């Protein structure tokens, strides 16, 4: 895989073996690397294949600390397994971005109201139960305590 752009020390945008743009994460993956160089495959922790606009998706991922990205993805995948659903990369990126922003809001002392929570609980009780379990797991592993309604 050839690097197209280094976003930070842990995130690179690449062209993979079959010509698709992909986003790779891993500790030190982009450290002292440049566009045109090959990727050290031993450093790859995750690979995301965006449906479209790989550049903007890569920037979202690059803006999230690697430890937080890994934690949120692990907790989300566990919840998806319990629910018995597949997890496309685009969904993972959306959830990771949402949870990261929620953590930043909490850190800044901002509180959000979720007026559709009761409706979501009624229409999707199992998904809501798993989301609440995700919040509990994230709270146990992070310094930021997300509100139950998140």
Predicted regions and their residues:
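A cross-family "folded-core" feature that marks the main globular domain of proteins
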Residues: 2-150
């Amino acid at each position: 895989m050839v690097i197209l752009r280094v976003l930070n020390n842990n995130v690179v945008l690449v062209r993979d073996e079959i010509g698709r743009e992909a986003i790779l994460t891993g500790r030190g993956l982009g450290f002292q690397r440049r566009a045109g160089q090959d990727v050290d495959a031993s450093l790859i922790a995750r690979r995301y294949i965006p449906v479209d606009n790989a550049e903007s998706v890569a920037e979202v991922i690059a803006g999230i600390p690697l430890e937080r990205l890994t934690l949120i993805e692990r907790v989300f995948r566990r919840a998806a397994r319990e629910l018995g659903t597949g997890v496309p990369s685009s969904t993972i990126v959306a959830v990771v971005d949402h949870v990261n922003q929620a953590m930043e809001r909490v850190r800044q002392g901002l509180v959000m109201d979720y007026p559709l929570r009761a409706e979501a609980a009624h229409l999707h009780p199992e998904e809501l139960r798993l989301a609440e379990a995700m919040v509990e797991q994230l709270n146990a592993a992070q310094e930021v305590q997300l509100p139950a309604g998140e």
